[in-house]
């Protein structure tokens, strides 16, 4: 079997991430949350405290081959909240919250989630992605529930502050999309409920993509789950597992699961690989149509093992890190369709 070097690097990258998410971390906080050790708050007037922003060049501006960055002409904004990159994989990553001046962590954030996830939305709107004092991955695994929550609260405070700064200084009445993954989705849920839902601002919400984290069907009172591809003022959510594993383990029927190939939430809704317009793995510039399928199953999205050169080595059963990327072009085109539908409805 001849596996290209770039593909092998990607497979190794996936295997390493799988190891990290399974609990084999080398560095953790190891003590209770201490507010005296919390890094300095961000200043969102500074462009370097944004991972992506229309006023600077960043990885969210890039596109796979054949696509165009349309931020300059878009009538919509996208507020993107990135997932946990602060994984405790190297010395110094032992605070409950990440520092904003950690240049290596920022570079990792930009070359991973900002490039591979935030860029999805540059066909629909201007992208604003704040840097924030993200909680250490241990905040999702530690037995110290008080410290876990305080770390997450610190991270969320930054996200809300960033959103409010964006609204005051750059939004200017424009409709917006909120998109988030994993830890970002945790904060997106709270942000939507605290700042958007049942408030005048909700009228400006094109859609929310709350991906990689559970959204209970009764979490929002006046913000519905999207049930059609062009519905607006609603949210989508999914968590992706390997199909055979998911059929045995998935059991959260009270969680919303959107099929990103059909944009419905019907239990058992299946879409074949032929409906997948293109996933994006490494190298970034290559779209991979038909990389996998999608089926809604008891609160989760089930997918066949993705097919790409070297995929025989990929044995992960939880496809969390690829929730967005397996359906890259479908999500991109859906965000564009919802934005167009929003303006059509307003006119």
Predicted regions located by residue number:
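Positively charged n-region of N-terminal signal peptides that target proteins for export
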Residues: 1-11
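Sec-dependent N-terminal signal peptides
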Residues: 11-19
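Surface cap/lid and interfacial helix-loop subdomains adjacent to catalytic sites
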Residues: 25-26, 157-172, 194-341, 345-346
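Active-site catalytic motif of lipid deacylating hydrolases and related acyltransferases
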Residues: 28-39, 82-174, 308-347
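Loop/turn elements at helix/coil->beta-strand transitions in domains of secreted/extracellular proteins
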Residues: 74-76, 123-127, 172-175, 203-207
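Gly/Ala-rich beta-loop-alpha elbow adjacent to hydrolase catalytic centers
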Residues: 180, 184
